[in-house]
């Protein structure tokens, strides 16, 4: 570019920075923020599937799936990890159904968790926005989008129709929130439910409530589904759960993480260390016996889980070796966008 044109451009940029503040316009090569840092999901398997070592900071994440599939459990594990690293977490409980005893069992510091149980959707989203704009909160979880009922619907009569009201509410809220989330470096997690669209003859009839806006604004979308029941004898003690990365703007998508969610305990970290450790030859498996560094840990997965619980130093050592081998670390991955082809039909906005 010749000098006259460069001077004209520099003058325009200076004027813009005077009007809108420093950093309003920059060269992409100078933008350090294009590298994405992350917060751990609390699961090595899921961190690996997400590709950047966890949920990206300054981004929107949607977790959806059928009832009792483990959506809230997955979100609570992320809160526990943030708090463990000295961060601040907020939980917008629109469903009014958070179990503090269960949250504490998952490792959440309930004494220092900021909780809001809003009366209507507008209030819940305004509280979420206030937390984000403060710049002091590391993660905000909204549980759930389907429960963010517009004020007009709550104050109306039973049977009144409110076509597209919730979708418009979400669309407006996300337009306001997205910029603030990016600037504050807050991770915003929206939990969503699933509905079935009437009259769909071909394809998937499942839809997520709240319109299309959340799908567009989300950098990561996770689909959580139960795969099978886990039993000890005749007693059902948990579920094998599949978490599919349906959309990922910060790493390759379509990866699947399989975890054991145990009733009352959450994701079994010992279970995933055994599975991943054996797969990557950090843990040796011979028949039903598992060993580490030549020392036998036990026969059968449940016995080895118990061994790892009783030996936290060995558990942490295996965890560290796995993270090094899988290259799980904070951020520094450039954006790549791709999404699973139309896994969900959309509600009308």
UniProtKB/Swiss-Prot annotation:
Transmembrane portions of the chain: none
Residue positions binding ATP: 65-72
An example Gene Ontology biological process = SOS response
Gene Ontology, cellular component aspect: cytosol
The entry's keywords: ATP-binding, Cytoplasm, DNA damage, DNA recombination, DNA repair, DNA-binding, Nucleotide-binding, SOS response
Q: Which SMART domains match?
A: AAA (SM00382)
The UniProt entry, under Pfam families, shows: RecA, RecA_C
| Main localization category | cytoplasm
Query: Where found in the cell?
Result: Cytoplasm
Molecular function terms from GO: ATP binding; ATP hydrolysis activity; ATP-dependent DNA damage sensor activity; damaged DNA binding; single-stranded DNA binding
Concerning NCBIfam families, the annotation shows: tigrfam_recA (TIGR02012)
- Entry similarity comment: Belongs to the RecA family.
Role summary: Can catalyze the hydrolysis of ATP in the presence of single-stranded DNA, the ATP-dependent uptake of single-stranded DNA by duplex DNA, and the ATP-dependent hybridization of homologous single-stranded DNAs. It interacts with LexA causing its activation and leading to its autocatalytic cleavage.
Protein name, UniProt field? Protein RecA
What species does this protein belong to? Staphylococcus saprophyticus subsp. saprophyticus (strain ATCC 15305 / DSM 20229 / NCIMB 8711 / NCTC 7292 / S-41)
